[in-house]
């Protein structure tokens, strides 16, 4: 179909999208068959450019602030019309996809992009249904025009690019953004607002299933190990990043994975390595003369990425869903070396650590954060994506854990034997050993030791993991230095938690001085 001599490519195949992208100079083929693209000066999400339209349905329901910035409805209408007119005057690409794998909870989405590669990215990350919108639900529209430049004075944006969610009109406008992760996270934020209304907990987590049907969830910020640890050759992958937990079901919000590529190796991450082939997209990965990806090269960014459909993963849940979780794991990357490799949490501790979301920003996905590593507290292990007040999500989590009897664990994928620069980071095989012990049920009734100050209970033995690692104090040469570091971390937790209005039982479940 054409509009004023411009071609509109609707629901063309992945192979055709690759062909169009290369023909238009949008990217190049790597030796492994993937399409390699560069995203320009933005190599991560841009939180300061993200807005939600303020209207009656959102006015009192959103936690407005630095993360959820309000945008006027009239300004949105003017900008949408401007971007749409601009895009209609050039070739563009349309695909029809679902967001949400469970029949009851999917959103039908018409995704329009100015570039072929971003459409391919959306096809990797969202769900390509056998039949589009069988239930006849109201359609959402994503309009993603990377070559449109916003003018802040005219458009009301913060810069030349923007991401704006409009719940009343079921529209997502993305303009001036080449980093495709914005598209994925925008639709995640949409579901994160809508699902709690249906008594479903939206989660920034990975999920997989064992041979016996047991489900494990892995919560964590980018770089803490969600994708790596859930990609386990002995288990079936549901998904690596975004899920919903309703009564009787855990379902993927997406149909693909978005894996960090920095220092990717076939030995440590075979599932991800094999998934990067024709049909996948590599963002900001450097190629050598033979077009072989050099995953160790971070000259473009620490946040290099691979997008691939779940079909590229051999062992996966065919329907992108499973039952409720036996094990819920909070992954934290602790820079201080204070937290143990694994702690067993009760319900109050689960609520406390879910709300705290303590971790480190590792090779951050956000622009302007630099390549450094720093500690952070990110509520629900994904504060940038949760529009409602944090308590809404925490209450739903505890409700689900209690109803199903899920066991909850805090797993440190960060430092041991000292803080960052002194100690060393837990290696992936050690953490995999911890995860395997959790999934086998070995820790359900394990004998524990209580750690004062940080107020956590750790198992005295974990099959396959060195016992001397389990109590972090034992791994420090200077025990007094450990105690001081523990007090310092406890102070950070206590200070951060002051903003939450919760029961005394939950407050008492955190670190104590």
UniProtKB/Swiss-Prot annotation:
Substrate binds at residues 45, 179, 185, 305. It is found in: Cytoplasm. It is an enzyme of class 4 (lyase). Involved in the gluconeogenesis. Catalyzes the conversion of oxaloacetate (OAA) to phosphoenolpyruvate (PEP) through direct phosphoryl transfer between the nucleoside triphosphate and OAA. InterPro entries: PEP_carboxykinase_ATP, PEP_carboxykinase_C, PEP_carboxykinase_N, PEPCK_ATP_CS. Belongs to the phosphoenolpyruvate carboxykinase (ATP) family. Its cofactor is Mn(2+). Mn(2+) binds at residues 185, 204, 241. Binds 1 Mn(2+) ion per subunit. SUPFAM superfamilies: PEP carboxykinase N-terminal domain, PEP carboxykinase-like. ATP binds at residues 185, 204, 220-228, 269, 305, 431. It comes from Pseudomonas paraeruginosa (strain DSM 24068 / PA7) (Pseudomonas aeruginosa (strain PA7)). One of its GO terms (cellular component) is cytosol. Monomer. This is Phosphoenolpyruvate carboxykinase (ATP). Its main location: cytoplasm. One of its GO terms (molecular function) is ATP binding. Pathway: Carbohydrate biosynthesis; gluconeogenesis. Its EC number is 4.1.1.49.
């Amino acid at each position: 179909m054409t509009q004023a001599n411009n071609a509109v490519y609707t629901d063309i195949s992945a192979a055709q999208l690759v062909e169009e992208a290369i023909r238009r100079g949008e990217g190049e083929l790597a030796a492994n068959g993937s399409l390699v693209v560069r995203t320009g000066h933005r190599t991560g999400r841009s939180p300061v450019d993200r807005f939600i339209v303020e209207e009656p349905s959102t006015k009192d329901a959103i936690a407005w602030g630095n993360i959820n910035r309000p945008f006027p409805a009239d300004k949105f209408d003017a900008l949408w019309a401007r971007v749409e007119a601009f895009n209609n005057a050039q070739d563009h690409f349309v695909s029809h996809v679902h967001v949400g794998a469970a029949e009851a909870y999917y959103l039908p989405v018409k995704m329009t992009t100015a570039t072929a590669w971003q459409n391919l990215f959306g096809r990797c990350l969202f769900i390509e249904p056998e039949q589009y919108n069988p239930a006849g639900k109201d359609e959402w529209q994503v309009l993603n025009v990377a070559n449109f430049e916003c003018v802040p004075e005219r458009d009301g944006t913060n810069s030349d690019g923007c991401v704006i969610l409009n719940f009343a009109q079921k529209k997502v406008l993305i303009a001036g953004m080449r980093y495709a992760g914005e598209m994925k996270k925008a639709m995640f934020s949409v579901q994160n607002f809508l699902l709690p209304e249906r008594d479903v907990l939206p989660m920034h987590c990975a999920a997989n299933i064992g041979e016996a049907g047991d489900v494990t969830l892995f919560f964590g910020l980018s770089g803490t190990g969600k994708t790596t640890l859930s990609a386990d050759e002995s288990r079936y992958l549901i998904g690596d990043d975004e899920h919903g937990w309703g009564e009787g079901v855990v379902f993927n919000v997406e149909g693909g994975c978005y894996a960090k590529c920095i220092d990717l190796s076939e030995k440590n991450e075979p599932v991800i390595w094999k998934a990067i082939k024709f049909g996948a997209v590599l963002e900001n990965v450097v190629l050598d003369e033979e077009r072989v990806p050099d995953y160790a090269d971070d000259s473009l960014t620490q946040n290099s990425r691979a997008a691939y459909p779940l079909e590229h993963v051999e062992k996966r849940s065919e329907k992108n869903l499973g039952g409720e979780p036996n094990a819920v794991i909070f992954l934290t990357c602790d820079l201080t070396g204070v937290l143990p490799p694994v702690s067993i949490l009760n319900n109050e501790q689960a609520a406390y650590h879910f709300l705290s979301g303590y971790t480190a920003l590792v090779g951050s996905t956000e622009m302007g954060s630099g390549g450094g590593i720093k500690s952070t507290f990110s509520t629900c292990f994904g504060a940038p994506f949760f529009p409602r007040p944090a308590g809404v999500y925490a209450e739903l989590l505890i409700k689900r854990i209690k109803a199903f009897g899920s066991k909850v664990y805090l797993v440190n994928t960060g430092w041991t034997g000292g803080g960052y620069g002194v100690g060393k980071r837990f290696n992936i095989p050690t953490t995999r050993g911890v995860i395997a012990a959790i999934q086998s049920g070995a820790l359900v009734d394990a004998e524990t030791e209580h750690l004062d100050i940080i107020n956590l209970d750790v198992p005295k033995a974990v099959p396959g993991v060195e016992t001397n690692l389990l109590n972090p104090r034992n791994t420090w040469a200077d025990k007094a230095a450990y105690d001081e570091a523990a007090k310092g971390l406890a102070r950070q937790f206590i200070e951060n938690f002051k903003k939450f209005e919760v029961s005394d039982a939950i407050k008492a479940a955190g670190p104590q001085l």
